[in-house]
A protein has these predicted regions:
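Absolute protein N-terminus
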Residues: 1, 22-24
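Bacterial N-terminal signal peptides that target proteins for export
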Residues: 1-8
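Generic detector of short, locally flexible boundary/turn motifs and exposed helical patches
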Residues: 21, 38-42, 49-53, 63-68, ...
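N-terminal mature ectodomain segment of secretory-pathway/periplasmic proteins
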Residues: 24-100, 176
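Solvent-exposed helix/loop surface patches that form functional interfaces
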Residues: 83-195
Length: 195
């Protein structure tokens, strides 16, 4: 019995190690006026039936007063189709925004608004932008707002994504690999630079 338990434990450890080694991880530094204020870790993990993308960020920003901003995202594809996504955006440990979508569910939710029917025309999401250049994609499904948003080719290997509230992100690629994201917001601009 002890031998069986030991062999089972070793097999579980080997399985976990195989999963970790198959994940693709990319890291970005978050800069505000060339000062390092945080980091982003994005991961793409193949599953038996598709792919899971995760992204976590942590930033310490001074906007009127010091704020710790954390975000997390999990997006899942099954057989190439978007099946679920969940996001959370926290400022000083208080939930500022969150969203949730599950394929087949009648309702989607973006905090703090009421639930709604989620309709989309594309399988491309912001999480995929960390790992793939969106060549020929006119829209990107933005998990935080659960809407398709316009993506425009703004130069060679450069794309501009416009959100419903008119916020803008600029994505810059080199040889198909994301190098930087320029984030334009009302009170500040940030740069996510590949680490």
């Amino acid at each position: 019995m002890f031998r069986f338990a030991t062999i089972s434990f070793v097999l579980v450890l080997l399985g976990l190690r195989a999963v970790e080694s198959s994940a693709q991880v990319t890291r970005f530094q978050v800069l505000k006026a060339d000062e390092l204020v945080g980091n982003v870790i994005a991961m793409r993990l193949p599953t038996a039936t598709g792919t899971v993308y995760t992204m976590t960020s942590h930033c310490e920003l001074d906007i009127i007063w010091s704020q710790v901003v954390r975000s997390s995202l999990r997006t899942e594809y099954t057989d190439g189709l978007l099946t679920s996504c969940h996001t959370s955006f926290r400022v000083n440990d208080s939930v500022r925004d969150s969203s949730s979508m599950i394929k087949g569910a009648d309702q989607c939710f973006v905090h703090p608004d009421a639930a709604f029917t989620c309709e989309r025309a594309t399988q491309w999401t912001t999480s995929r932008l960390y790992f793939e250049e969106p060549v020929g994609q006119p829209f990107i499904f933005v998990e935080s707002v659960l809407k398709d948003c316009q993506l425009v080719l703004s130069g060679p290997n450069r794309y501009t994504l416009t959100f419903p509230n008119r916020n803008v992100n600029h994505y810059i690629y080199k040889e198909g690999v994301l190098q930087e994201i320029h984030v334009e917001r009302t009170l500040m601009d940030l740069v996510f630079r590949r680490a």
